[in-house]
Design a protein with these regions (language model features):
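Long, low-complexity, charged/polar intrinsically disordered regions in eukaryotic proteins
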Residues: 1-42
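E1/E1-like adenylate-forming module used to activate ubiquitin-like modifiers
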Residues: 156-159, 166-261, 271-276, 288-320
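Helix-biased "structured C-terminal domain" signature
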Residues: 284, 291-771
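Structural alpha-beta junctions
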Residues: 151-162, 190-197, 578-582, 702-710
């Protein structure tokens, strides 16, 4: 019951043992040509006279000495032994125990099973014996015939564990991997140290795996965390019905499908107990019984898992200071100033895209995208999700996405936004301080320093909120005496810790008790923490500049697209011309001096102009323009199929629909360039490239300080993802939604010479920005 030469001697001692080929091989000799070994994996040819002599003798009826003896006189003992050693070294031979003395004793119980384990790289005879000495216990959490499962186990050589004994492996059968009963199953197996294989039946796509190993690899809670992320739509119903788990789904399967799933589960159990370790044991393996396709979905361990990991990882990261370090730029072109290229980013983080175990189900090209636009979608926008049934219905249109000049760039951008939104969602392990603003003193920042709602908006909040838009929702006045949760953020300008309401820092499913809510303003994923910090800051500057222009309706200088001399610009313009659109751009640069550009486009062939726009900010004006143009392309699929009769919009939100149907360049003159101001080209912005992201961090820190503001950062990176995510906050900078408190919105346009005096509150643009 061993490899023939496993003891290093030749011929091996055997006490009557018989030498022959392994069970998965069938030998055939073609005289004068070769001896052939046929298996499920192909044919092996053995050439030479030695093979023609020895192969017929290796039929398992002779001892090693008998093979040497019968090979003579054609081969000397030394020649035969040398050839046998070569065959043994190739893993082709097996030494079997002597045949049973009783003529009624059964032969090998299952020659095909023995051959299967041989093909797996094991000793088939030894493996069958090992399986007979180990045990498995089926555990049913669903309506399944355990006798049928037990019969399948026995048919594959597995031994069922007797009652009240420990099994070597549990086979847990359920109908949903998020069944609340699995918490108890997981806890019991961790306490006993017993591995268990999870299987879901009762569906057209059965799930098999992984094998959970207490103390090693991911646990059920790691997997459940990822699975819940794909089932947000069930949570409002679960909450409304008071369920402790997801709503039960009706079974949808045939008897044949159930039998296949059971047999595959038993196969995985047998492989595990036999000692085979493959990637399938660490994956959720799905079988599409309609299309007969199997897919492996690797399960990742969450380092911060509260059950099998270190639940304090996130808290320690957030509590500590944000200390930027040197990050040389690997990319310094129109792709951006990054530490990694888009292809490197995708190679490193692309595994996060998986419909079962990833954080985003898929990344796909945006429906309706014209060929000249690279726009991709990456699933639900977690910043817009809701914990109510009504919110769910309203939020089904909200998707995260990505942009770029190429599909690779846009796909990577979409992944980055998905990670950004996921990382910015509250998961329960974030550090908080529960107290009131008054009790916390100077470290705490009043939320309206960031939200910037005017007192009149707060008083008139019912009218503002009547439209139901989450982006334009006005909260109740903040109660400074009421305790709430606060999150530590790091001040790069003050080099100290500050506090902001947690409900403003992380997305949540339910309305927070303090009435506040988070938005994505200043959230960014990057190739490094420094990269994410810089990108988040640039977004704040961009949106502040957009707000100054939009709500004051100032006329801004145009941007001379030809002056940039970029071939991609002409390609885009030609593409827009093919869909009967005009393209232009405006300079929105504010007192921060960082180039901010708005790109706009309108239909030229019908009264409703379906005006779309995009914005971009960067130290390099070429990159600012590129970002504005590619962001504008993300809106184009929503209006690309509009008919002259006014149908074909891909959204139902009233605000963008009203804009597209009624706003034109003529009745919204602030959308057009100021004819009295010269158009801007790339040389009109002072720009000196830097080679290290740390230099950019220093620049934005000092720039913020010079404006009398504070640069705050919250590291939202998740240990299980690895992609850095930072939320950047600069109290006083405007988001581009309608936030009308006193400050920059009124004063800065006057300081820049755009307005002779501050625009009165009641004369601000009544059309809210809807992106």
């Amino acid at each position: 019951m061993t490899e023939a030469g496993g003891n290093g001697r030749w011929p091996p001692a055997g006490d009557g043992a018989r030498l022959g080929f392994k069970s998965h091989l069938r030998a055939t000799v073609v005289p004068g040509e070769a001896a052939y070994l046929v298996s499920q994996r192909g044919v092996t040819a053995l050439y030479g006279d030695h093979s023609e002599v020895l192969v017929p003798l290796l039929d398992g009826t002779r001892s090693p000495d008998g093979v040497l003896r019968d090979a003579a006189p054609a081969l000397t003992a030394e020649e035969a032994a040398a050839s046998l050693r070569a065959l043994d070294a190739a893993g082709l031979l097996r030494l079997r125990p002597a045949a049973p003395e009783s003529p009624t004793a059964p032969p090998c119980p299952d020659p095909a099973a023995e051959a299967y384990w041989d093909l797996a790289g094991l000793d088939g005879v030894h493996t069958l014996d090992r399986l007979a000495r180990t045990s498995v216990r089926p555990v049913a959490l669903t309506d399944v015939d355990l006798d049928e499962v037990g019969a399948a186990c026995r048919a594959s050589g597995l031994t069922l564990a007797p009652p009240d004994t420990e099994a070597d492996l549990s086979l847990v059968l359920c109908d949903d991997y998020l069944s609340p009963r699995l918490r108890e199953v997981d806890a019991g197996h961790r306490a006993a140290g017993t591995p268990w294989l999870l299987v879901a039946l009762g569906t057209a796509t059965p799930w098999i795996g992984p094998v959970f190993r207490p103390g090693e690899g991911p646990c059920w809670h790691c997997l459940a965390t990822r699975l819940r992320g794909h089932r947000h739509s069930e949570r409002p119903l679960q909450r409304a019905l008071g369920l402790d788990g997801p709503p039960r789904r009706p079974h949808a399967t045939l008897a044949a499908g159930r039998a296949i799933a059971v047999q595959l589960a038993v196969l995985e159990a047998a492989k595990w107990l036999a000692g085979v370790r493959s990637s399938s044991h660490g994956s959720v393996n799905t079988l599409d019984t309609l299309g007969l396709r199997t897919t492996a979905h690797p399960v990742a361990r969450l380092p911060q898992c509260a059950v099998c990991g270190d639940p304090g990882l996130v808290a320690r990261r957030v509590d500590g200071p944000f200390v930027p370090v040197s990050r040389p730029k690997a990319v310094h072109d129109l792709n951006g100033h990054r530490a990694l290229t888009p292809s490197q980013m995708w190679e490193r983080y692309g595994s996060l895209v998986d419909p079962v175990t990833g954080i985003v189900k898929e990344i796909r090209r945006a429906p309706g995208s014209p060929e000249f636009v690279s726009a991709f979608l990456s699933g639900r926008n977690l910043a817009m999700r809701s914990g109510t049934l009504a919110g769910l219905r309203a939020g089904l249109r909200s998707l995260s996405g990505g942009k770029g000049l190429t599909d690779e760039e846009a796909r990577t951008s979409a992944l980055g936004e998905a990670v950004e939104r996921y990382s910015g969602t509250r998961q329960g392990d974030e550090p908080v301080i529960h107290d009131s603003l008054r009790a916390l003193g100077e470290a705490a920042i009043h939320p309206n320093s960031c939200q910037l709602f005017d007192d009149r908006q707060l008083r008139d909040r019912e009218r503002w909120n009547a439209g139901g838009s989450r982006l334009h929702h006005v909260p109740p006045p903040f109660d400074t005496r009421r305790p709430t949760d606060w999150t530590p953020v790091w001040s790069l300008t003050g080099r100290t810790r500050r506090l902001l309401p947690t409900s403003m820092m992380y997305f949540g499913e339910e309305e927070a008790p303090d009435g506040l809510s988070a938005d994505s303003n200043g959230n960014a994923a990057g190739s490094s923490p420094e990269d994410a910090l810089v990108q988040g800051f640039l977004e704040l500057v961009e949106r502040d500049a957009v707000a100054l222009w939009w709500y004051n309706r100032t006329r801004q200088p145009g941007v001379d697209l030809d002056a940039f001399g970029e071939p991609y610009i002409e390609r885009l313009r030609e593409g827009y011309r093919t869909v009967r659109r005009e393209v232009w751009a405006l300079d929105l640069t504010s007192d921060f001096g960082i180039p901010v550009i708005a790109a706009l486009s309108r239909r030229t062939d019908k009264p409703a102009e379906d005006i779309v726009f995009g914005f971009g900010a960067h130290f390099d004006p070429r990159l600012a323009l590129r970002r504005a143009l590619t962001e504008m392309g993300q809106l184009l699929p929503l209006v690309g199929g509009v008919t002259p009769e006014g149908g074909g919009y891909r959204v139902t939100d009233p605000e963008p629909l009203d804009w597209w149907r009624h706003s034109t360049a003529a009745n919204r003159p602030y959308l057009r360039a100021d004819r009295d101001a010269p158009a801007r080209g790339p040389r009109d912005w002072p720009y000196s490239p830097t080679g290290d992201l740390l230099e950019d961090v220093t620049t934005i820190t000092e720039l913020t300080r010079s404006h009398g503001m504070e640069l705050l950062a919250l590291d939202q990176s998740r240990p299980d993802l690895g992609l850095p995510v930072v939320k950047v906050i600069v109290p006083g900078l405007r988001p581009f939604w309608p936030r009308f408190a006193p400050g920059r919105l009124y004063n800065t346009p006057v300081e820049l010479g755009r307005c002779a005096e501050p625009t009165p509150y009641d004369r601000l643009n009544p059309i809210p920005l809807f992106v």
